[in-house]
Curated annotation (Swiss-Prot):
<feature type="binding site">
    <location>
        <position position="12"/>
    </location>
    <ligand>
        <name>a divalent metal cation</name>
    </ligand>
</feature>
<keyword id="KW-0963">Cytoplasm</keyword>
<comment type="function">
    <text>Nucleotidase that shows phosphatase activity on nucleoside 5'-monophosphates.</text>
</comment>
<feature type="binding site">
    <location>
        <position position="103"/>
    </location>
    <ligand>
        <name>a divalent metal cation</name>
    </ligand>
</feature>
<feature type="binding site">
    <location>
        <position position="45"/>
    </location>
    <ligand>
        <name>a divalent metal cation</name>
    </ligand>
</feature>
<dbReference type="Pfam" id="PF01975">
    <property type="entry name" value="SurE"/>
</dbReference>
<keyword id="KW-0479">Metal-binding</keyword>
<dbReference type="InterPro" id="IPR030048">
    <property type="entry name" value="SurE"/>
</dbReference>
<dbReference type="GO" id="GO:0046872">
    <property type="term" value="F:metal ion binding"/>
</dbReference>
<keyword id="KW-0547">Nucleotide-binding</keyword>
<dbReference type="InterPro" id="IPR002828">
    <property type="entry name" value="SurE-like_Pase/nucleotidase"/>
</dbReference>
<comment type="similarity">
    <text>Belongs to the SurE nucleotidase family.</text>
</comment>
<dbReference type="GO" id="GO:0004309">
    <property type="term" value="F:exopolyphosphatase activity"/>
</dbReference>
<dbReference type="InterPro" id="IPR036523">
    <property type="entry name" value="SurE-like_sf"/>
</dbReference>
<protein>
    <recommendedName>
        <fullName>5'-nucleotidase SurE</fullName>
        <ecNumber>3.1.3.5</ecNumber>
    </recommendedName>
</protein>
<dbReference type="GO" id="GO:0000166">
    <property type="term" value="F:nucleotide binding"/>
</dbReference>
<feature type="binding site">
    <location>
        <position position="13"/>
    </location>
    <ligand>
        <name>a divalent metal cation</name>
    </ligand>
</feature>
């Protein structure tokens, strides 16, 4: 008999977000884990790894519209959610894995440094639990559910197949196809150099104070685009390692990364990763 996994779900778009609902729905279809949600009560995008250092946060058990094992809403950031889940709710029996997302928009390239979705995953990793951050390019409506249960299961099992902390987490971005073409597959790549940039937009100037919006951002790309960006444009799912031996990915050699790519390709193309649950 295979052991069912215990998976903690979180995000930065809020517990009621469409991306969370899609993640839950497709994990339920895959049917290999018991799901627990601890997510922000409200939108927390752009929070990175910030946490509520100077003020208390609350956590409340809520009824979730899908059949999960339990769900809680937190008044703080994505990192607050992970801290409360691992340090209080599940401190006596930690989850096997933390999945964060599915984010409404890209977290490819340097956007990862702003991302609350990725911040939650990093907090889990630093706390000793493997984690994956998921994001959908452009808009959550581009997410394709046809093969999603299999993809989510394989990525989860792959994350657990690596001896912690040799390779302890991933940042995954799903491509957006303008013609709704099916994803071509998955590729392990390094973080791209592209980033979101925009000028502050003045909303109100009352003579004493000015109010700005910082949300008007566009992706900045060089002519020499990164492997991550090119892979997404070619309609492949990108899988980027977050930490290798608790060190930034940039510190490992090209040869070592090629070995990681080969191991990833072999695992994903194998018939099943079910033996990991024995």
């Amino acid at each position: 008999m295979h052991r069912r996994l215990k998976i903690l779900l979180t995000n930065d778009d809020g517990i009621s977000a469409k991306g969370m609902s899609l993640l839950v729905a497709n994990l339920l279809k895959a049917d290999f884990a018991d799901l627990y949600i601890v997510a922000p009560a409200t939108e927390q995008s752009g929070k990175s790894m910030s946490f509520s250092y100077t003020q208390p946060v609350s956590i409340e058990k809520v009824d979730y519209p899908q059949p999960v094992a339990g769900a809680w809403a937190v008044s703080g950031s994505p990192v607050d959610c992970v801290k409360l889940a691992l340090g209080d709710l599940f401190r006596n029996a930690l989850p096997d894995l933390v999945l964060s997302g599915i984010n409404h928009g890209s977290n490819a390239g340097r956007n990862i440094f702003y991302s609350g979705t990725a911040g939650a995953a990093m907090e889990a990793i630093l706390s000793g639990v493997p984690s994956i951050a998921f994001s959908q390019e452009q808009h959550i409506s581009f997410f394709q559910e046809v093969h999603a249960p299999e993809i989510l299961k394989k990525l989860s099992l792959y994350a657990l197949s690596m001896p912690f902390p040799i390779l302890s987490g991933f940042n995954v971005n799903f491509p957006a196809s303008e013609r709704n073409e099916e994803w071509k597959g998955m590729r392990l790549v390094t973080t791209g150099k592209e980033y979101a940039c925009g000028m502050p937009k003045l909303l109100v100037d009352d003579g004493k104070r000015k109010f700005f919006s910082l949300s008007d951002c566009q992706i900045v790309m060089d002519e020499d685009i990164s492997d991550e960006c090119r892979t997404l444009l070619e309609n492949y799912i990108t899988v980027v390692p977050l930490l290798v031996r608790n060190s930034p990915l940039a510190l490992i050699s090209e040869t070592k990364f090629q070995q990681l790519q080969e191991a990833f390709d072999n695992f994903i193309s194998s018939a099943s990763g079910a033996t990991l649950l024995d």
